[in-house]
Amino acid sequence: MSLPQTYKRAVFKELGHPLTVEDAPLKLPGPNELLIKVEACGVCYSDMYSQYNGLGGGFPIVPGHEIIGKVAVVGSEVRDWNVGQRIGAGWHGGHDGTCKACKQGYFQMCDSTAVNGATKEGGYAEYTLIRSESAVHIPANVDAASYAPILCAGLTVFNSIRNVNIRAGETVAVQGLGGLGHLAIQYAKRMGYRVVAISRGPEKEAAARELGADEYIDSNEGDSGEQLAALGGAALAVTTASTGEAITPLLKGLGILGKLLVLSFPSNLTLEPTDLLKYGLSVHFWPSGHPSDAEDAVRFAENTNIASVVEKFPLEQAQQAFESMLSGKVRFRAVITMD
């Protein structure tokens, strides 16, 4: 694979500034790194942390952690990858292998974790470097743009749902019909659950049912928790809402020993302990996953025909893609492509 001297990248140069597309000298990988020729990179809400230095990566920084491409160069000490192989990378950008989390196999919880697109350069670029321990095997036949969101949004919902141990056949409610929510509905349905979608407005019901929801709750029509309880309640409520005010009512819709799974960074989340204690309810968070988890999520999606619904943007329109994601103009997921 021939390599250029320079490559294009979309970069945050200063705190709070918009993305700038520029040419930069191409760097070759270190001993334990891989150079990826990027095909597609999803645009995630958490990319905003890169814009505001939320994880201390500094500037300039290339965001993006839903990366799919092909191996362009293999580092001298990397043994299990070859040039031309399909490869991906998600939020998890590397780990130390020595902390308690790593010793238990929870590499994404590493005390010294690296984050693609936040503490190191990410995938809003024609090429990017990743650490070999963060690399994800991607099937050669899948569409890069459709599968890129699986590496964060899909992985997060898949890995969190399977780790809260809800029995097949139970009811799972999914609050929010965006990038995470539209994949959560599909994963939950394919896992064998009765799925109740919760969103605002009657116009979203058709899309929710097309994705696999068995029931739809319009939260504009009344308390979402009370409506969920009227449908029999849920063993699990998955929420992607950004405010605590939207999340708290869901507790009313949980059954005995029900679980609330929070997959967002909500502001002002206040929980009333009385109902939690009375009914044995619990609140859970889950930090995405590591490469093996991502490969499970991709394999499950491929085997069960789960599909990300995406809107594509060329790299030159990276700022437009980012703004469209933040404003909600993109219904499900924006993806930057290098075509």
From Swiss-Prot:
GO cellular component, one term: cytoplasm
Catalytic function, reaction form: a primary alcohol + NAD(+) = an aldehyde + NADH + H(+); a secondary alcohol + NAD(+) = a ketone + NADH + H(+)
PROSITE patterns from the UniProt entry: ADH_ZINC
Cofactor note: Binds 2 Zn(2+) ions per subunit.
Residues that coordinate or bind NAD(+): 176-181, 196-201, 204, 263-265, 287-289, 295-297
Entry binding sites for Zn(2+) 1: 44, 65-66, 152
Protein name (database record): Alcohol dehydrogenase notN
Encoding gene (name): notN
